[in-house]
From Swiss-Prot:
GO terms for biological process: regulation of G protein-coupled receptor signaling pathway; response to Gram-negative bacterium; response to oxidative stress; tetrahydrobiopterin biosynthetic process; tetrahydrofolate biosynthetic process. Pathway: Cofactor biosynthesis; 7,8-dihydroneopterin triphosphate biosynthesis; 7,8-dihydroneopterin triphosphate from GTP: step 1/1. Optimum temperature is 60 degrees Celsius. Zn(2+) binds at residues 121, 124, 192. The lineage of its organism: Eukaryota, Amoebozoa, Evosea, Eumycetozoa, Dictyostelia. Pfam families: GTP_cyclohydroI. The keyword Metal-binding applies. The gene is gchA. One of its GO terms (cellular component) is phagocytic vesicle. Transmembrane segments: none annotated. This is GTP cyclohydrolase 1. Belongs to the GTP cyclohydrolase I family. Toroid-shaped homodecamer, composed of two pentamers of five dimers.
Length: 232
């Protein structure tokens, strides 16, 4: 198994505020936050008021009048939108998976592909969007199919970079299901490459994260890549 995808279950850290797993990557320790379900910040009036004030300051800094008709409700709308786009911080993988792990004595590959994902690049806070493909080989236990998409959604709804998002999805499935292997591929278009910078519409970024048998066995890995490309 590569340094980037060690087992995450060996060193479980108890923390009252959030579920955190510690893994060794060969260069020290990395904390992997699987989250804890919390009251949505969108219902926190203090947070909303602070964010609205900040948005008004941004609008004024752009030379706009935040009190003109078209912008009067923009601070509230933008604040609520940002909280929705980042609601993954308030969600827990444990809560999402719940009791949807089933003993099926199944050992063949399971693939859910073309999961739509939307996220915000943490560098410019502009969107990137695309498709996520998830595959795993169960060790008897299988996960409800919709839960794979929900796990991807938890990590996509945070400030992200695509490489980390791909890795976190794989880590969460590995840690909670303990399968024989996990593979995740994300294909995405980044607005920071379309609307600014190099301004190259049509460019896409592909990232992958594999562990277990997908890393050790090239034939298994090739089967996964073949399945996510079939009939396209």
């Amino acid at each position: 198994m590569s340094d980037n995808l060690k087992s995450y279950q060996d060193n479980h850290i108890e923390n009252e505020d959030e579920e955190i797993y510690e893994r060794s990557n060969g260069k020290g320790k990395e904390l992997v936050d699987f989250g804890k379900k919390r009251e949505p910040l969108i219902h926190n009036h203090e947070v909303l008021n602070t964010m609205q004030s900040s948005v008004k300051t941004l609008l004024s800094s752009l030379g706009e009048d935040p009190d003109r008709e078209g912008l009067l409700k923009t601070p509230l709308r933008m604040s609520k939108a940002l909280l929705f786009f980042t609601q993954g911080y308030e969600q827990s993988v444990d809560e999402v998976i719940g009791e949807a792990i089933f003993n099926e004595n199944h050992h063949e590959m399971v693939v859910v592909r073309d999961i739509d994902i939307f996220s915000l690049c943490e560098h410019h806070m502009v969107p990137f969007h695309g498709k996520c493909h998830i595959g795993y080989i169960p060790d008897q236990k299988v996960l409800g199919l919709s839960k794979l998409a929900r796990v991807a959604e938890i990590f996509a709804r945070r400030l992200q970079v695509q490489e980390r998002l791909t890795r976190q999805i794989a880590q969460a499935i590995q840690a909670h299901l303990n399968p024989m292997g996990v593979a995740v591929v994300i294909e995405a278009s980044h607005m920071c490459m379309v609307m600014r910078g190099v301004q190259k519409p049509g460019a896409s970024t592909v990232t992958s994260s594999v562990c277990g048998i997908f890393e050790k066995d090239s034939r298994t890995r090739a089967e996964f890549f073949s399945l996510i490309k079939s009939n396209k």
